Structure formats: C-alpha cells, structure tokens
C-alpha cells in the first residue's frame, strides 16, 4: 500500500520498448529504476520477448508489471506499467506510439524504416511520455508536434538548446553577409 502513496496520481508508464523479431533492443526508454543496469534491462527484455512473441494477446503480467504489446512485421512494441496502472491508458500510449510512427513512416512500420527515422521515434516518444507521465494519446497531435520540431517554432515553445542553435545560425549568417 505504501507504493501507492509514493506514486504520482497521474497515469504513468515504467518503460517503452521496441524489439526486433529476434528480441534484440532497437529502442528502450526506462522511466524509473526498476531495472537500474543495462544487464538487468536486457534480461527483462528477453524475458518479455520470450513470453509474448508467440501469442496473439495484447496484455501480459510479468514480474509484477503490466505489459501491453503489439507486433508489426518484424517489430514488437511494448509499454510497461506497474501492476495497478490502468491497462487502457497503457494501451492508449501503445496505440498512439504505433499510429504516430505509422503516419510518420507512411504506413511502413518495419525495422529498416524505423532505423532510418530514429530521430522521429525519439521525438514522438518524448511527446507522448515525459518522465514516465503520459502527456498525449492523440497520434495526430504527436505527428503535428514532431513535424513542428523541424520547422520554425515560436521562441516560447523552443527548448534552450533549440534557442541557442537558432542564435548560432543567425549570428553565422550575419557574419557571412
């Protein structure tokens, strides 16, 4: 019961994983220290893959965690939450990630296309979940925000690194004139 008190009241995820059809990691983002070392993370990922890759279900309970998953051609997508997390919210995150990638990759959600567009994957995951807290579940909004990152974004919506990069570009162009 104490764990419930310590957890935030917002919907959260513990990890988002994408594995290939051999169970090898293509993308992994852990939001807490349930598995603090890379060795423990990879062992957990192999365990998940071995339990889920032969079944058609969408949810599993493993090591006290709720795992929702989906496969596409040669990829396996996983969203992991605590055992008391709302499974529908975890599935909403999974569907949002998959649908966002499907739109970004023009419905070609497979390993090669994903590896060629990893920056889009990182941006999409950051738009959907921040620090484990679910921010967005609408794939249209995610795709729109990811597309904005490549265009001129208003100064109020930019990160510090984006502002510095923009300032460097402006200074460079003013010196070249």
Swiss-Prot record:
The lineage of its organism: Eukaryota, Metazoa, Chordata, Craniata, Vertebrata. Its main location: cytoplasm. It is found in: Cytoplasm; Golgi apparatus membrane; Cytoplasmic vesicle, COPI-coated vesicle membrane. SUPFAM superfamilies: SNARE-like. GO terms for cellular component: COPI vesicle coat; cytosol; endoplasmic reticulum membrane; Golgi membrane; transport vesicle. Keywords: Acetylation, Cytoplasm, Cytoplasmic vesicle, ER-Golgi transport, Golgi apparatus, Membrane, Protein transport, Transport. The coatomer is a cytosolic protein complex that binds to dilysine motifs and reversibly associates with Golgi non-clathrin-coated vesicles, which further mediate biosynthetic protein transport from the ER, via the Golgi up to the trans Golgi network. Coatomer complex is required for budding from Golgi membranes, and is essential for the retrograde Golgi-to-ER transport of dilysine-tagged proteins. The zeta subunit may be involved in regulating the coat assembly and, hence, the rate of biosynthetic protein transport due to its association-dissociation properties with the coatomer complex. Pfam families: Clat_adaptor_s. The gene is COPZ1. This is Coatomer subunit zeta-1. PANTHER family: COATOMER SUBUNIT ZETA-1, ZETA-COAT PROTEIN. Coiled coil: none annotated. It is a peripheral membrane protein. Gene3D superfamilies: 3.30.450.60. InterPro entries: AP_mu_sigma_su, Clathrin_sm-chain_CS, Coatomer_zeta, Longin-like_dom_sf. Belongs to the adaptor complexes small subunit family. One of its GO terms (biological process) is intra-Golgi vesicle-mediated transport. The modification N-acetylmethionine is found at residue 1. Oligomeric complex that consists of at least the alpha, beta, beta', gamma, delta, epsilon and zeta subunits.
């Amino acid at each position: 019961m104490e764990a419930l008190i310590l957890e935030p009241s917002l919907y959260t995820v513990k990890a988002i994983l994408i594995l290939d059809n051999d169970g090898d990691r293509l993308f992994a983002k852990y939001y807490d220290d349930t598995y603090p070392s890379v060795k423990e993370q990879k062992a957990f990922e192999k365990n998940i893959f071995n339990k889920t890759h032969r079944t058609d279900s969408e949810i599993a309970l493993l090591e006290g965690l709720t795992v929702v998953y989906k496969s596409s051609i040669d990829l396996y997508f996983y969203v992991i939450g605590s055992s008391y997390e709302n499974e529908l919210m975890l599935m909403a995150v999974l569907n949002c990630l998959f649908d966002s990638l499907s739109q970004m990759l023009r419905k070609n959600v497979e390993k090669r296309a994903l590896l060629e567009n990893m920056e889009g994957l990182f941006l999409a995951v950051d738009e959907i979940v921040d620090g484990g807290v679910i921010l967005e579940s609408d794939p249209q909004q995610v795709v729109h925000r990811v597309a904005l990152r490549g265009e001129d974004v208003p100064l109020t919506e930019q990160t510090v690194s984006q502002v510095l990069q923009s300032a460097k570009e402006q200074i460079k162009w003013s010196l070249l004139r």
